[in-house]
Amino acid sequence: MDLISALEGLVPELEKGLDQASSLEGLEALRVDFLGRKGRIAQIMSRLPSLAPEQRPAVGQTANSVKERCNALFESRKGALKAGREAEALKRFDPSVPGRAPWSGTLHPTTLVMEEICGVFQGLGFDVASGPEVELDYYNFEALNMPPEHPARDMQDTLYITDKVLMRTHTSPVQARTMLHRKPPLAVVVPGKVYRRDSDLTHTPMFHQIEGLMVGQGINMAHLRGTLTAFVRAIFGSDTRVRFRPSFFPFTEPSAEVDMSCCMCGGQGHIDGSPCRVCKTTGWVEILGCGMVDPAVFEAVGYDADVSGFAFGMGVERVTMLKYGIGDLRMFFENDVRFLGQFAR
């Protein structure tokens, strides 16, 4: 059999193979067998040099014609197989099945809790104030009874930009700015980001605080206790117990730490006989710091000596962790949608 006959004989063989091909994968294997670099057409054409020169053009033309016919047969069969696959898929499609709702974003849990806290205090008559995150040393320290070389400055690792400019270490500078521009009576809460040179498993260089201030005539510790007790019970439940412990802050006197009954174990110190990992068996967890505003702070902002007031501050991430039982602070900063999606409203 000469080469032209061999080439022509491949077409009916291919047609038979195509009729038996039932998948795109099988079709591709057949294409490689006939048209591949080492396929059957290539094997026949490898014998072309053995022919006389005058016979080669006819064989070459036949080879090109056979390749074109084979490609046309492949494309036709490929289209038929794809159409069959799509038709089969449509048979399984049920238009009555509800569609999948697109994933919707949500506010970060820190933002949700910050808004909730501000909402509680707004209900108690407080305004919401804000101020710069890049702050002057005067407002961050000196106006809050912490002059240069004051030992209380060692309590905070500060990120300085220049000798007199820094990243605020708390939101209390906004309280000083507010008092310089407003006369009592006043009541404000100040949410925002703060920065400290601290980074480990339980601390981050940037976190969120909410600090509050109330100033007026006759403001005393009873007002402070009533306000913060109402706040804690609004966030954690009406049966939450609250206690105040003596403490020290340079801009309040007297000062106190506020503890609440553990929200994990209900203040029992244990859960089903096992020690509570949140309160470490004490039944109490620290929630915020507070105190009566030091007269030196009022003097720095030009207030009369007959006014009094209280201030308080808390870390929003800590409140969020206690409220939702989150055990790892790093989860707030990893942007894992599996975590964030749990707080969708």
UniProtKB/Swiss-Prot annotation:
Catalytic activity line of the entry: tRNA(Phe) + L-phenylalanine + ATP = L-phenylalanyl-tRNA(Phe) + AMP + diphosphate + H(+)
Binding site for Mg(2+): 253
Record EC number: 6.1.1.20
Gene Ontology CC terms: cytoplasm
Annotated compartments: Cytoplasm
Entry's Gene Ontology molecular function annotations: ATP binding; magnesium ion binding; phenylalanine-tRNA ligase activity; tRNA binding
Disulfide partners: none
Stored Pfam families: Phe_tRNA-synt_N (PF02912), tRNA-synt_2d (PF01409)
Keyword annotations: Aminoacyl-tRNA synthetase, ATP-binding, Cytoplasm, Ligase, Magnesium, Metal-binding, Nucleotide-binding, Protein biosynthesis
Main localization category: cytoplasm
GO terms classed as biological process: phenylalanyl-tRNA aminoacylation
Complex and partners: Tetramer of two alpha and two beta subunits.
HAMAP family: Phe_tRNA_synth_alpha1
Name of this chain's protein: Phenylalanine--tRNA ligase alpha subunit
Organism for this UniProt entry: Desulfovibrio desulfuricans (strain ATCC 27774 / DSM 6949 / MB)
